[in-house]
Amino acid sequence: MDFRRIILWLVAIICFQATAFGQHKFVDRSTDVLCLAPAATGLVKALVEKDRKGVLQLTLSTATGIAVNYGLNACIKKNRPEMPNQPSWSDRHAFPSTHSMAAFDGATFLMRRYGWKWGVPAYAVSCYVAWGRVHANKHDWWDVLGGAAIGAGAALIYTRPFAKKVDLTISPAVFGEQGGGVHIAMQF
């Protein structure tokens, strides 16, 4: 009877470890894909709206974020938590997180350009990406916070709110002997 319990516990522990390893790998791979989702959503939204300025703003913010991110990666050369003894010449630098930069750049673009209904889900995905990079032992919290700050900052610099076309009419108004004025009408 005791032998069966030992076997049962060993099987349970092995299954738990296999599940944990599988989950770890799933989180790692899912963050590789989802880090691009907010920016891809922003690009599709801008193209559907025929928002050329939005496409340009997203392109500029992403290019700036990438340039700053890789520049800091080359200067700082902080090793990843998964490989602390990696040589300093390695291209596997941790700070700042490129995944977090890309995710938060896209999320901030969506929030600022198209409002909270687009931004909140994008920020939820971005937070998952940041958490996932730490969970997968690719980065620590400083790395993902640095990447998030770079991405959000780049998007804040370039992105302006999207305004639908409005009709604005300005015309002089004459009120007889009482004087005149300006008549302004706007149609949304």
Outline where the language-model segments fall.
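N-terminal signal-anchor/start-transfer transmembrane helix
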Residues: 38-45
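Interfacial segments of alpha-helical transmembrane regions
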Residues: 45-65
